[in-house]
């Protein structure tokens, strides 16, 4: 194995420990039994690509639908442009808003969504750069917490972030008898439209887990960091 692959395996092992034992793990907080580790595609460096950001100036407010048919308020920063297996791809880059740090996130779907990976989509997180150059490492793509339990509210990718190619890299679908990998309610919400025109609900931004979680387990947008209470 390469040093890169070794490092990634260490990150994944740390994330499994976090998911197994930490109070802010969705499996611990939602009391989901039977966790035996997350599932991943084989590590493949072809899905570690360079991208350039085509900025939207000024950034625009955007509303992403959530698994509870709500909306998450984001700032749309621009489009990341890159190549995968000879195909030009574009993904919208989002930020949670002013005063929320320098981390941005990219929700996306691809040709594996709904089969080998979580149907409503996966996430990448990025640290913002000054030169608008980014590395997109899809081997580090991960599921939102709502992939494991409906105790969490998570934004879905907009229609513009549906990639035209399969990306068999990163985290695969989680599934057990009580938490199917592709919840039908989530898929109905996704099909109703990715990006909304007007806000109806702005989910409460919860406290970050960055201080407590290992690096491999931190990669979550802030709107999905903690479950909201059911009414």
Task: For each feature predicted by the language model, list its residue ranges.
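Poly-acidic low-complexity segments
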Residues: 3, 137-139, 220
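A compositional/structural signature for long, glycine/proline-rich flexible linkers
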Residues: 1-100, 109-112, 118-125, 150, ...
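Polybasic, lysine-enriched low-complexity intrinsically disordered terminal tails
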Residues: 185-231
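Immediate flanking context of iron-sulfur cluster ligation sites
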Residues: 133-149
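Mixed-charge, glycine-accented linear interaction segment located at domain edges/termini
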Residues: 143, 155-157
